[in-house]
Design a protein with these regions (language model features):
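A generic local secondary-structure boundary/capping motif
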Residues: 1-2, 31-32, 58-66, 80-87, ...
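Catalytic-pocket segment enriched in acidic/His residues
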Residues: 1-5, 20, 102-222
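Extended, compositionally biased flexible segments
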Residues: 1-71, 123
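Conserved active-site and cofactor/substrate-binding residues in soluble primary-metabolism enzymes
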Residues: 5, 15, 38, 52, ...
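Short helix/loop capping segments that flank catalytic or ligand/cofactor-binding pockets
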Residues: 20-21, 53, 83-85, 105-107
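Short Gly/aromatic-enriched secondary-structure transition segments
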Residues: 24-32, 85-96
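Short, structured patches in soluble enzyme cores that scaffold and shape functional sites
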Residues: 45-47, 70-72, 76-78, 96-101, ...
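Broad gene-expression machinery/nucleic-acid interaction feature
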Residues: 69-73, 92-96, 123, 141-143, ...
Length: 222
């Protein structure tokens, strides 16, 4: 994984997969928003959520299952401020697998911190340098698979992104600077599978390898 001491902020992107937006149906146009988002919708996975391959995802007491969101993470290599889409990938140092874990919830636009920012809720996988993955067209067709206890339960592809990686960086850097070490995850597809304590989840992305993590039940309070 990317050395946590060198990592900046980890950002997640909501509703950037076409099928995730479609799954909302009429709710995407309901008050108070009344229309689908026209700019990237971001949230933060704080430092307490970060773990590496092989480390345990903790299932909070009273929670039966967790949603396992598999996504591609873009690791920023140099400060990106108002960059053009055509140049955006030049600001990327490499890529990681991100397991964006959540407690199941219905609030898509403004999920409470307790649903997405619990300890261990962001395993981050092996770092792959940009040049080892390939050009823009490769990034836009990466296959993503989630397995639970060795069985593939969910498949997705970056081809379903509303904003592919280069455009996402350009749009986000248009309103805030992305700093070296930041990780911008591109978003989770619809139908994220659920897993429970005692199971093991594995995420693979073409060219990036594998990220494996067991799930364990939360222990008693200290």
């Amino acid at each position: 994984m990317l050395n946590p001491s060198r990592r900046g902020t980890v950002y997640g992107t909501l509703l950037n997969h076409a099928d995730a937006l479609a799954a909302l149906g009429a709710a995407a146009c309901a008050p108070p928003y009344k229309a689908p988002p026209v700019a990237p919708v971001l949230y933060i996975k704080p430092r307490n959520t970060w773990i590496g391959a092989g480390e345990a995802i903790v299932v909070p007491e009273g929670v039966a299952e967790l949603e396992i969101g598999a996504t591609l993470g873009l690791v920023i290599g140099r400060a990106a401020c108002r960059v053009r889409e055509a140049n955006a990938l030049a600001f990327v140092a490499g890529y990681v697998i991100v397991c964006d874990v959540s407690m199941p919830h219905a609030s898509y636009y403004r999920p409470a911190l307790r649903f997405k920012a619990r300890d261990t809720f962001c395993p981050i996988g092996p770092f792959m340098p940009r040049d080892a993955v390939g050009a823009t067209d490769v990034l836009e067709s990466l296959r993503i698979a989630v397995s639970i206890d060795g069985e593939v339960v969910h498949r997705a592809s970056t081809s379903g992104l509303i904003r592919p990686p280069a455009r996402l960086i350009a749009d986000v850097s248009g309103f805030m600077t992305l700093s070296p070490g930041d990780v911008l995850s591109v978003g989770v597809a619809a139908g994220a599978p659920r897993a429970r304590a005692g199971q093991r989840v594995s995420i693979t992305i073409d060219g990036l390898g594998r990220l494996d993590n067991p799930l364990v039940a939360e222990g008693p309070p200290a």
